[in-house]
């Protein structure tokens, strides 16, 4: 199983690099990794269990990992907080790692993003302005319509999540490093 975890970190590493350089995570990478994970887990299940049932168990666990790991990112995408490539990358990581390890990598990725984003904003000198606008967005629904503070879309900050996803996948691999391959 460790080989699948390493593959997930490698896919996340390539995605982080392309996301940092271009702002996009390519479909060939995410969907290719997702498809390869399904096929590889099917054949790995057959090899380990010496039966078709083992293959379908591996395939099912891989598909479940993709779905489970895409749920929270899909909600964030629906709310306009992340891009579609991030969802597909989380799904590919879930398919490669299965649900539990995929969710572990996802949790580490969101923790990394929660640490990196404020540091990045502070480096650019935008931290306190962004925090003020964020507070206004949180408080606005509780204000009267005439007292609401509008935030123009051009002042909203966008954060590339790919590097944080790589950090999450790498930490997950390190946490499982001593396990059986």
Label for each model-derived stretch:
Residues 1-82, 87-181:
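A membrane-topology feature that recognizes alpha-helical transmembrane segments
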